[in-house]
A protein has these predicted regions:
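Glycine-rich phosphate/diphosphate-binding loop of Rossmann-like nucleotide-binding domains
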Residues: 37, 42-62, 120, 128-202
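Acidic, His- and aromatic-enriched active-site or binding-groove loops in soluble protein domains
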Residues: 123
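N-terminal ligand-binding/catalytic initiation module
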Residues: 1-118
């Protein structure tokens, strides 16, 4: 009884969904299972335990409600469209365990088209923790961030996000040496995508 009142108000002013519903405290934890932990592409359903675990962390440490959504699709455009179509239900989107380089494309496009926060945990969560560790290590060793050289062993989503945050924190671009499974990423090396090439050194 009475539910029609907020329905009518939200239809006139969609922002009122934050006042009259759980939207503002509800996050979608979304994966296609293409990069599950260190296990690789095991499919969307296999990612469900990780997504449910993330939902538990949201509730336990931030009292944020969340729903895990596993998308059985590896096409970035299809994933983007799916998330766009359900985004109105949520106050935020947490992308999880989506392989690079698709994860970069998906996150960037969603940030452009949605009016809610979009966060790719594998990139930014890892980068925040790693940069905090770097800052503390530099403080203990009495070194300046602008003088240190850093080797990043790996060139996936997490590694690239870490390197980007290192640069934003003051590490010089030329002082970051990134390696993938084929070795150091350097200028002139063949068969590297646009995302890796941003870290190519002389």
């Amino acid at each position: 009884p009475g539910v029609a009142a907020p329905v009518k108000e939200i239809s006139k002013n969609p922002e009122l969904a934050y006042d009259y519903t759980s939207k503002g405290n509800l996050v979608a934890v979304i994966s296609n299972g293409s990069a599950i932990l260190g296990l690789g592409n095991l499919g969307s359903l296999a990612s469900k335990p990780v997504m449910e675990g993330k939902s538990v962390l949201f509730k336990r440490f931030a009292d944020i409600d969340s729903i895990d959504i596993e998308i059985d699709n590896n096409d970035p455009n299809s994933i983007i469209e799916t998330i766009k179509n359900i985004s109105g239900t949520f106050g935020g989107i947490n992308l999880e365990d989506i392989a690079a380089p698709d994860c970069f494309v998906i996150e960037q496009k969603l940030k452009e088209v949605l009016d809610i926060p979009v966060f790719h945990d594998d990139q930014h969560g890892t980068a925040i923790i790693t940069t905090a560790a770097l800052i503390n290590a530099l403080d203990i060793s009495k070194k300046k961030i602008s003088n240190v050289k850093i080797v990043v062993n790996g060139a996936g989503a997490s590694a690239q996000a870490c390197a980007n945050l290192f640069k934003s924190s003051g590490v010089k671009n030329e002082n970051i040496i990134m390696c993938d499974s084929k070795g150091v990423i350097y200028k002139g090396r063949k068969n590297i995508d646009q995302f890796k090439s941003a870290f190519a050194i002389d």
